[in-house]
């Protein structure tokens, strides 16, 4: 009976090694794309104040004399229904966007939608959920996209007082964080190589038995 070229444990190790190499290559390619856009001046890295953004069903307390803000800070906003929107009407290469919004009540879902060139309508297919990276700080990872517009839904319940100061586009971050997988990618890197190794081992065993 012929012996397999690689044992199951060796296949598993090889699969994880290949996954690690592919991940590093993916990150390096992403860095190259980012640097290309940055050198061309097509990658905005800026803070956009609330006053520079277009809002819908999301208004400052100062816009209505009958509204009473939680305190005297002029940055308090109120969502007037369960589908408020914040729009950034620009274009550029976006890797991450950060929403500065301290909610006084639970906001429900906080999400970002983006448009690609030629698109006019936002859709669920281009939706990114926020990660809370600090109190009142919601980070959206777009993975590097050329966008022609952004829409952020700051809450999904309505009637939420929110201390809103604006958004940050492509904020500076340490270079090494580009090589750290997100939670979703950790799951992929943990399970896909194991499944691939198991399938490869099963296929090898099948052909070895067939030839014996």
Show where each model-derived region lies.
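Juxtamembrane interface at the cytosolic side of transmembrane helices
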Residues: 193-212
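Extracellular ligand-binding interfaces
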Residues: 58-96, 100-139
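Short beta-strand-plus-loop segments that form exposed binding edges in beta-rich domains
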Residues: 151-159
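N-terminal Lys/Arg-rich, disordered targeting/topogenic segments
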Residues: 1-6, 210-212
């Amino acid at each position: 009976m012929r012996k397999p070229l690689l044992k199951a444990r060796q296949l598993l190790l090889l699969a994880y090694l290949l996954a690690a190499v592919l991940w590093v290559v993916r990150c390096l390619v992403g860095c190259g794309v980012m640097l290309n856009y940055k050198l061309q001046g097509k990658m905005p890295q800026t803070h956009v104040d609330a006053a520079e953004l277009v809002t819908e069903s999301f208004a400052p307390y100062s816009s209505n004399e009958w509204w009473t803000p939680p305190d005297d800070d002029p940055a308090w906003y109120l969502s007037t229904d369960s589908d408020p929107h914040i729009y950034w009407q620009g274009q550029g290469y976006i890797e991450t966007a950060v929403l500065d919004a301290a909610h006084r009540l639970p906001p429900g879902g906080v999400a970002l939608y983006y448009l690609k060139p030629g698109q006019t309508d936002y859709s669920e297919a281009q939706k990114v959920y926020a990660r809370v990276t600090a109190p009142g700080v919601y980070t959206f990872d777009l993975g590097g996209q050329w966008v022609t517009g952004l829409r952020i839904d700051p809450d999904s319940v309505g009637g939420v007082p929110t201390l809103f100061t604006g958004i940050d586009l492509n904020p500076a971050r340490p270079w090494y964080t580009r090589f750290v997988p997100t939670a979703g990618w950790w799951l992929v890197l943990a399970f896909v190589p194991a499944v691939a190794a198991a399938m490869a081992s099963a296929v090898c065993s099948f052909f070895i038995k067939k030839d014996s």
